[in-house]
């Protein structure tokens, strides 16, 4: 699963997800992409599950690019712990995804295979997504 090797600080505040993605919203590497339509936190487990679903479907052909990285720690307190005594320990990592963000890219396969692979990956994610094709310049 994806996680940072090291960070400047162990814990982070939750923050807010306002507006649309203003970076990472164009196709950069592949021919096809999966674009987020809703704001959400995507966990490293969800990213890995989506990657596996796509890899299994396309088998040996094609290349997958993962365009989101879980760099935000989410802390949790132990179960049945009383209030107070500080913030919990980091439990898992999430990527903050805003609407318009390209999450996965795919190249080297025909469109039907890419569309189905992205559809299978989208079932592993907690948000609505859409399949987009790179416009030829």
From Swiss-Prot:
Record carries keyword Lipid biosynthesis: no
CDD domains: Ribosomal_L16_L10e
Biased composition (Basic residues): 1-17
Keyword Transcription in record: no
Segments for region (Disordered): 1-24
UniProt xrefs under Pfam families: Ribosomal_L16 (PF00252)
Gene Ontology annotations for the cellular component aspect, listed alphabetically: cytosolic large ribosomal subunit
InterPro entries reported in the protein's UniProt record: Ribosomal_uL16, Ribosomal_uL16_bact-type, Ribosomal_uL16_CS, Ribosomal_uL16_dom, Ribosomal_uL16_sf
Annotated GO biological process: translation
Signal sequence residues: none
NCBIfam families: rplP_bact (TIGR01164)
HAMAP family for this protein: Ribosomal_uL16
Protein name in the entry: Large ribosomal subunit protein uL16
Native source species: Trichodesmium erythraeum (strain IMS101)
Gene name as annotated: rplP
């Amino acid at each position: 699963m994806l996680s940072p090797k090291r960070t400047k600080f162990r814990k982070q505040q939750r923050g807010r997800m306002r507006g649309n993605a203003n970076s990472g919203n164009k196709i950069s590497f592949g021919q096809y992409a999966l674009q987020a339509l809703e704001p959400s936190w995507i966990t490293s487990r969800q990213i890995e599950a989506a990657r596996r679903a796509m890899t299994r479907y396309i088998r040996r052909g094609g290349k997958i690019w993962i365009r989101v990285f879980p760099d935000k720690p989410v802390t949790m307190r132990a179960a049945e712990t009383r209030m107070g005594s500080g913030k919990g320990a980091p439990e898992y990592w999430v990527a903050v995804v805003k609407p318009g963000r390209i999450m996965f890219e795919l190249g080297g396969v025909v469109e039907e295979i890419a569309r189905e692979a992205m559809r299978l990956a989208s079932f592993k994610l907690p948000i609505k997504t859409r399949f987009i094709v790179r416009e030829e310049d």
